[in-house]
Amino acid sequence: MKQRMKKPSLGTFILILILIGILAYVLWQFLSPKLGYKSLSDLEQRIITNAKSATDDNFFWAFGFDISDFRIKVVEQVGNRIESYQVVADPTIIRLYQAGTGGVISENILSQLGSSAPKVNSWREIIQLATKASLTSEIIENAINQKINNALSLVGAGQSVSKNTIVNANLPVIFNFDRPRGNFLSSFIVPYIPFLLISLFGFWLFFRLSQNSQAGGGLFNPGKNQAIRIKSNKKFTDVAGNAEVKEEIAEFVDYLKNPKKYAAAGAKIPKGILLGGPPGTGKTLLAKATAGEANVPFFFISASNFVELYVGVGAKRVRELFKEARAESPAIIFIDELDAIGRSRGSGIGGGHDEREQTLNQLLVEMDGMVENSGILLIGATNRTDVLDPALLRPGRFDRSIIVGLPDIKEREEILKLHAKGKRISQNITLANIAKRTPGFSGAQLENVINEATLLSVREKTQVITGKQIDEAIDRVISGPAKKNRVITEDERTMVAYHEAGHAVVGIKLRSGVKVQKITIVPRGNTGGYNLMLPEHEKYNSTKSELLASIAAFMGGRAAEEIIYGKNEISTGAANDIEKATKIARRMVTEFGMSNLGPIQYEQDNSSPFLGRDYFKNASFSSQVGHEIDIEIREIISSSYKLAIATIQEHRLLLELIKDTLLEKETIVFEEIQQLEQTLKPLPKSTEIEEKQKVNTKDILEELMGSDFANNQEKSYENEDQNQNSLEAINYNIDDQDDDKNDSESKIDSSKEQ
């Protein structure tokens, strides 16, 4: 719908007029004619030229003195044009030009006037010759006498003033024009125009800021409500997975739409929902869907918007937010990244009473204080529920705390299906397989996988998104883009291949509940290669044997290097593997109770969110117990490392096969790994199968024409495929018969030769 243009306000018109006035004044000052300057020698030459001129083409219209500014101002006729200029001269020169008699005129000047010129005794007479003929000496004398009379009236009675006294007193003496005097406009109004315009502009600016202040914002009221009222087009159908979370929030939305239904049953709806969980799981998306479903005023604000420069701003913004929400009740308030103001009180820089705590205290009062908040639903979202203040989490404020966790395999498939809409994906790809290969991925990461695969399809100019592009997209999300141009020596490349093959052999043979899905020696990020090991089934608990097998798999790379190159030639490539193995071993001893020390938790999470997570970790046990913990961790790592060495030595042939295949292909996948394990032979050249560049037409037709039409069309495609397969079988049989015939003929020929 076309929006109506907003009518300009009176203040806008005033601002435009002020700006036009300033611009006009600047242009007037810039374009107004100004007197130029000439030197005294040039002026003397012009005086002589005009004095000896026999025509009226060169003469002075005006020749005036301004002793107070030491200026001689001239208006001169030069041919067909009139020039105006001024000359800077000291009082001595000016008095010389003014004097009627006296003064020395050089012979050079007199010779330049010519013999036909009248005899002159002063510069004043020469200037008279150079002026217009009608300006006689009598007119000039009367002008001087008038100046004298004006001076006498100023001095007072009983005083005598002579002509020479007036000249020496630096009073202006004008030959044929008076010194110009400005009128009232130019003398009193024009000089003050810039000041008036700037004053008007300042008044207008102050007026506008005051208006903003009255409206609740601007410079004079920084405590304005920063919340944004949004209208979202998202629905719960746009949120894949998180069925339980959507069910909980849908109950709140239904209450806002039908409060009487719950009031009749005597039910009190919870006042707030806290959405927690890892990043990228859809907390903000759920809030957008809630805004789209509720059809009530929805106020969105980030918690960081409350606390800014001025003291007390945060508390005031909280009051303004709830005041506006109460005025439009029923309403929803969504505060994103709540931990920015909701952290536990009593800690932090500035002691226990800083600006953030004032804001939190005001939020606690507004959520459940003396003023009733009936009809207001508060939704908070954060990734750090562990650092929130306990008073914020109690019933009556956030009654329900919902963890939006990482999606399971079924939810991942739903999320992939949602993001795959409108994308041309190869028919050979199933979203279920992608979901299996992406355990631990959040919804944001799954969306990124589909988007990266689409970008790769556009880059490579393929008709559909292929399985290879999906693989590359998953790798990009996990480790970043491949560094194909990295220069690496053949020896180092071989060592990396042995390292990754060692991981794979241990992971395959120990049966730790994971499958080696992919091995690559293509460098990505800070790694020279990696193994993608995924669990066979979705599990939320791990056994001791599985953890030990995982540690052994991590140590497999270092074990392979030691077996092939010796202890003195092992590389730094196992640094990250050792770090991960050590973390698992430490947790087995200190948290899981899987050691000889018994089922005791030695490391409690007493860490401070302000001083660092590991600051107080080792404060709950003695140094002797710490030494015993280190011994147990060392024992777990050492035994797992020995197990990895024994496994690789037992299956040395598989290690060499995987290494050779990696050097040849750089990347091998699960099916190829399985074939190497089962046959213990190199892969045949024909295992590289090109994927069909075929669009999954059924999904597209189902979206456009309906499921019945899509099913019928698919059946027709299947019949065509069966007919094509029959033709191929007939051709194959004919080819076989031809081959048999050729074989028999060759046998006959060979027998003949014998």
From Swiss-Prot:
Positions of transmembrane segments = 10-30, 187-207
Q: Describe cofactor binding as the record notes it.
A: Binds 1 zinc ion per subunit.
Q: Where is this region: Disordered?
A: 713-754
User: What CDD domains does the entry give?
Assistant: RecA-like_FtsH
Cofactor names from the entry are:
Zn(2+)
| SMART domains, alphabetized | AAA
The EC category is hydrolase
Query: Where does the protein principally reside?
Result: membrane
SUPFAM superfamilies from the UniProt entry: FtsH protease domain-like, P-loop containing nucleoside triphosphate hydrolases
Indicate which residues the UniProt annotation says bind ATP.
Answer: 277-284
Arranged from A to Z, the UniProt key words for this protein are:
ATP-binding, Cell membrane, Hydrolase, Membrane, Metal-binding, Metalloprotease, Nucleotide-binding, Protease, Transmembrane, Transmembrane helix, Zinc
Residue stretches of biased makeup (Basic and acidic residues): 743-754
Q: Family per UniProt?
A: In the central section; belongs to the AAA ATPase family. In the C-terminal section; belongs to the peptidase M41 family.
Q: Which PANTHER family match?
A: AFG3 LIKE MATRIX AAA PEPTIDASE SUBUNIT 2, ISOFORM A, ATP-DEPENDENT PROTEASE
Briefly, what is this protein's role?
A: Acts as a processive, ATP-dependent zinc metallopeptidase for both cytoplasmic and membrane proteins. Plays a role in the quality control of integral membrane proteins.
The name this protein carries in UniProt is ATP-dependent zinc metalloprotease FtsH
Task: Please name the taxonomic classification of the source.
Answer: Bacteria, Bacillati, Mycoplasmatota, Mycoplasmoidales, Metamycoplasmataceae
